Amino acid sequence: MKIVSAEVFVTCPGRNFVTLKITTDSGLTGLGDATLNGRELPVASYLNDHVCPQLIGRDAHQIEDIWQYFYKGAYWRRGPVTMSAISAVDMALWDIKAKAANMPLYQLLGGASRTGVMVYCHTTGHSIDEVLDDYAKHRDQGFKAIRVQCGVPGMETTYGMAKGKGLAYEPATKGSLPEEQLWSTEKYLDFTPKLFEAVRDKFGFNEHLLHDMHHRLTPIEAARFGKSVEDYRLFWMEDPTPAENQACFRLIRQHTVTPIAVGEVFNSIWDCKQLIEEQLIDYIRTTITHAGGITGMRRIADFASLYQVRTGSHGPSDLSPICMAAALHFDLWVPNFGVQEYMGYSEQMLEVFPHSWTFDNGYMHPGEKPGLGIEFDEKLAAKYPYDPAYLPVARLEDGTLWNW
């Protein structure tokens, strides 16, 4: 089954998405997501200029060989642009292979390891009262795992805080330059345990409670944070400190038993090898769109399973519904599954990407359609052209550039 075309689409039905469509001489097509938030055009260019021309004529069934060709053949490898492109190709080829087998992808991977995929949602607010209202709404929808973020008194902007009441959190801003935000670690460390106390006092311990620190703390500050929230039994604290300094997680481990999740910015198994091998984390956050597709994620998950590290894949709506569909198939199969992030998508987005997944009482299922179970409406997508948007940058209150 030969590949006869590979096309790249950049569309913005509310957010910018990069979609790869591979077509074979049998008529079967496959879809892949190559979205890299704020850097969509470089990935699209890499696909168009370097990847798509080299796909033509290749056997679509040779997924592993094609993966190795674009990984080893790149020479300048493992970067986010290269790996996002490889991920999209890999996703599309698995979509084709599962369609050729006339089975949903999770069956081709080895079958279901569970009846549904537990997903966690996002709650947000400018105050604790707003967060409690938002939490109640998501709990009533059936979510069993809920991420909690809140505005911090004395700070105009805080990671995870929606720009208006009732709005979903959207970090990227339209325009030609990134937004600059101010950050105070002391204000954050003083306030955030009070947020978790309020949530547990009102709702108890029935739901899993998650929190994202988004690389903002130093190792000793992260240790202090983890110790301060142990009574509230967080499911995890995410990205407490920049993961480039992987040895520092040993220090955090020595001070707290709050579970740690890391890895949404990782692009390969090499990025997380030390953290997993030394059991410095509990959940690996790599995502199918950035870590080498289904093939790359299988390697990471298999390695992590040796050390009882579970998956907790990054999955906000800055990755397209194609990634979400692929993630749900992967999550349903992978033995060492932990939880899957799910922010939901707007009606506009789902019109461009019709899907077959379902949500019921806190769990999702990818559906039984052959392949990924998702489609792409090219004509509708063309009505939503690329719209430049950038993730913010952060500074301390004295103006020092900090980790966003």
From Swiss-Prot:
Keywords: Lyase, Magnesium, Metal-binding. Pfam families: MR_MLE_C, MR_MLE_N. Mg(2+) binds at residues 212, 238, 264. Its cofactor is Mg(2+). Transmembrane segments: none annotated. GO terms for biological process: amino acid catabolic process; carbohydrate catabolic process. One of its GO terms (molecular function) is magnesium ion binding. It catalyses: D-mannonate = 2-dehydro-3-deoxy-D-gluconate + H2O. Its EC number is 4.2.1.-, 4.2.1.8. InterPro entries: D-mannonate_dehydratase-like, D-mannonate_dehydratase_GalD, DgoD-like, Enolase-like_C_sf, Enolase-like_N, Enolase_C-like, Mandel_Rmase/mucon_lact_enz_CS, Mandelate_racemase_C. Has low D-mannonate dehydratase activity (in vitro), suggesting that this is not a physiological substrate and that it has no significant role in D-mannonate degradation in vivo. Has no detectable activity with a panel of 70 other acid sugars (in vitro). Belongs to the mandelate racemase/muconate lactonizing enzyme family. GalD subfamily. This is D-galactonate dehydratase family member PC1_0802. It comes from Pectobacterium carotovorum subsp. carotovorum (strain PC1).
